[in-house]
């Protein structure tokens, strides 16, 4: 029986620029950074976070480079949950995160949409409990 999702791969152009965005701007932590023969096994997650992690996977050919920033076909790729929307929203703004929509209220919670360094759309969301 499948019991969870542990990692989701994100194709990136460069490991270091992806770490800079996700860790320095968004406040994620590197969970593992293992050098393999031809790549790195590089996992990140929100500091103090739980659940799924993002595996940063450097593109190695033209086919993979073509999907950078387009892995969700223009839809939202990630949904990042917060327990303090206003504080996190203001902090991300102060760090130069590019919000493109919101904040706005939906029936399920408060949402703002931003783009990562490659143009992937990401929701910051605080759910109604």
Map each language-model feature to its residues.
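Vicinal oxygen chelate
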Residues: 1, 10, 40-43, 80, ...
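A short, acidic/glycine-rich surface segment
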Residues: 39-41, 62-67
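Eukaryotic phosphotyrosine signaling hubs
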Residues: 5-6, 73-77
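Short, charged/polar surface micro-motifs in flexible loops or helix N-caps
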Residues: 47-52, 60-63, 84-86
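Core segments of cupin and vicinal oxygen chelate
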Residues: 2, 10-53
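Conserved beta-strand in the GNAT
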Residues: 54-55, 123
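Short secondary-structure boundary/capping segments
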Residues: 33, 45-46, 67-70, 89, ...
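Short amphipathic alpha-helices within nucleic acid-binding modules
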Residues: 21, 86-91
